[in-house]
């Protein structure tokens, strides 16, 4: 059954992966519309909002102040090239009872009432989109850039006072997963490092081949988790492609693996270093 949801993607960077993220999401959850803000028409079956190359501030401004103009369904499902639906059976119509839902933030200094959540793969209601355009919500990139922090932390009290409903931590975890380390089955995910746990071999390989920045820490963690999960061919492919862009990639990867092993207290990660 098609949901009264508009998939929204804003990207002028990872065109092929962005298109695939939309396709994968639609295969898990049929949605009424797709709206793409991009410099290319990467999804002809949707509505294309032509934009120039976007800065991070441009992205945040669109997400906070412009979505209400382009979303005509009850909810918007924000998708990114590394944030998408994954496990169809984990969809729950209860998600639609809330105005904002995304993966919980892992930061220890956030109290429980400020854990929801990540905007990279998130569900947002019309109520929220219309409140965000209010002059009471001011985008101040010199103080705070990430648009999801405006929703989940900075303006949360004001939004709640105007009727915005946030889900429990448990329901947010069922909706999406971002936290590293530690895999939890959920409807969707955000972050390249989660690809090894959520995408099949075909989609994972395409992700690895089209990934724009193969030497970032997130991408390194992705390669490590392919190896950790016994998907050595994909791990080695990720390493091989990254080495073409950065000759010292293996040394960087070993440092990342050592750091991850310490932070997660995972001795298996140390064993992976020997296989690189």
Give the location of each predicted region.
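Non-catalytic N-terminal targeting/anchoring module and adjacent flexible stem/linker
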Residues: 1-2, 191-276
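Short beta-strand-to-loop acidic/aromatic patch adjacent to the donor-nucleotide binding site
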Residues: 73-84
């Amino acid at each position: 059954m098609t949901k009264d949801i508009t998939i929204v993607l804003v990207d002028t960077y990872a065109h092929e992966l962005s298109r695939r993220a939309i396709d994968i999401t639609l295969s898990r959850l049929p949605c009424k519309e797709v709206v793409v803000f991009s410099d290319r028409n990467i999804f002809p079956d949707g509505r294309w909002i032509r934009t120039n190359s976007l800065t991070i501030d441009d992205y945040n401004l669109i997400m906070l102040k412009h979505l209400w103009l382009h979303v005509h369904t009850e909810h918007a499902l924000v998708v990114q090239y590394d944030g998408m639906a994954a496990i169809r059976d984990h969809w729950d119509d209860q998600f639609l009872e809330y105005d904002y839902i995304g993966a919980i933030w892992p930061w220890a200094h956030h109290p429980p009432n400020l854990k929801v959540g990540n905007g990279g793969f998130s569900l947002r209601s019309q109520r929220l989109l219309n409140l965000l355009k209010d002059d009471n919500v001011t985008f101040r990139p010199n103080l705070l850039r990430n648009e999801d922090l405006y929703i989940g932390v900075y303006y949360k009290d004001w939004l709640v006072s105007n009727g915005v409903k946030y889900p429990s931590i448990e329901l947010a975890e069922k909706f999406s997963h971002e936290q590293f380390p530690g895999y939890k089955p959920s409807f969707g995910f955000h972050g390249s490092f989660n690809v090894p746990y959520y995408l099949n071999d075909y989609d994972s390989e395409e992700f690895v081949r089209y990934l724009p920045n193969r030497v970032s820490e997130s991408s390194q963690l992705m390669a490590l988790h392919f190896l950790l999960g016994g998907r050595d061919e994909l791990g080695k492919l990720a390493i091989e492609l990254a080495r073409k862009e950065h000759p010292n990639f293996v040394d960087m990867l070993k440092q990342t693996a050592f750091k991850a092993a310490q932070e997660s207290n995972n001795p298996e990660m140390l064993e992976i270093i020997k296989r690189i």
